[in-house]
Amino acid sequence: MRIIKNIGILLGVLVLVVGAIFIYLNRGLPDEIKPANFNCLSLDEGTFMDFDNLPKNIYGIGLSYAGHINETASDFDPDGDPPVFIKANNSITKDGNKVKIPSRKRMLDALEQLEPGISETVNQKFKSLPALLDYEVELGFVLLEDITSANLKNADYAPKIGFFIANDFGARSLAVLGEGQANRYDYWGISKSFSGFTPISDKIWIPKGFKANSIPCINIETQVNGEVRQHQLTSDLIYTPLQMLQAIHRKYPNKLLLKGDMVLTGTPGGVVMSTPRWIVRLAGMIGMDRFDKLTKVTSDKKDVAKFLKAGDKVLVKGEGLGSVEVNIY
C-alpha cells in the first residue's frame, strides 16, 4: 500500500511539474499590443487614380497586427521597429492573372543568392521541399513625393501617400530557413519576391488633404475559393505610416525614399502559417535549428495540405478601396 501511495504522490507531482512547465511555455507577452492612434479617413475624402508604373522599391512591414504576432508566436517590443524587408519590384501582378508556385530550383536559386552554399545543404537534408505558399492581405501605400531624412525627424510630418490593396504572397519554407539568422528578414524578402507574389488593386486612393497619422479605416479581407480566411480593420494596425517610413529609413539608411516607392503595411491574423507559442519556446529550449524547424513544418502532410495549391483562387479586398484576385498554378 505504501508503494502504491508513493507512486500516486510521484505521479501527482509529475502532473504538477508538467502543468507548470506548460503554463510557463504558454505565457503571454510581457507588453500589451495596442493599435496606433489614427486619424481615420473615409473614402469620400479622396479620389481614385490609375497607376501603372513599377516602383523602384517595394518595402514590406511585418508583424503589425496583434493577431498575426500571436498566431506566429512572435516577440513584440513596443519600443522597437517592426520587421522590414525588400520585395522585388517585378513581383507585382494585377487582377485576374495567374501566380505560379515556385519550383524547388527557383527557391534554391533565390536562397543561393542570399546565402551562398546553402542550396547544397538543403539538397542533402530535404528530398522534398514544398513552397508552403501563403497569402497575406495588406493595406499598401505609395509615396507621392520623395521623402527626406529631415521629413522623418518631424513627429508631425504627414507623408503624401496614396493607398491600395495588396496580397503579399510568401513561400514560407524559405522564411523558416531564416530562423536564427542575423539577417532573418532578408529571407522573408526573398520568400515574397517571386514573379506574381505581389498582386495589387488597379487604382490608388489619394486623400484630398494629408494629415498626420491618417489612413482609410476599412475592413480588409482574404478569401480562398470563396472561404473567408482573414478579416480585420486597418485601424488595428500597430504602426502609423510615418513610423513605418522611419523604420525603413533606419533599416536602409543609404536608400532614398522615392516618389513611387511602395510600402506594404503588414497582414492581420488568419494566415496558414501559425504555431502555438509554447511550441516555439520549447523548440528554442531544446536547441532546434532552422533545418530542424523546416523538417517539422514540412513533415506533416496534413499541415502542408493547408497551404495554397494549384487551382486555388485567392481574393483580397479592402472595403471600397479595391480588390485583386489571382489563380494559383
Feature map (PLM): residue ranges:
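Charged, cofactor-coupling segments
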Residues: 101-109, 195, 199, 235-236, ...
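Short, well-ordered loop/turn sites that connect or cap secondary structure elements
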Residues: 256-257, 308
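Structural motif
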Residues: 260-261, 312
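A short, acidic, amphipathic alpha-helical segment used as a generic capping/interface helix at domain edges
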Residues: 244-253
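N-terminal Sec-pathway targeting helices
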Residues: 1-16
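Active-site microenvironments in enzyme catalytic cores
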Residues: 21-231, 239, 258
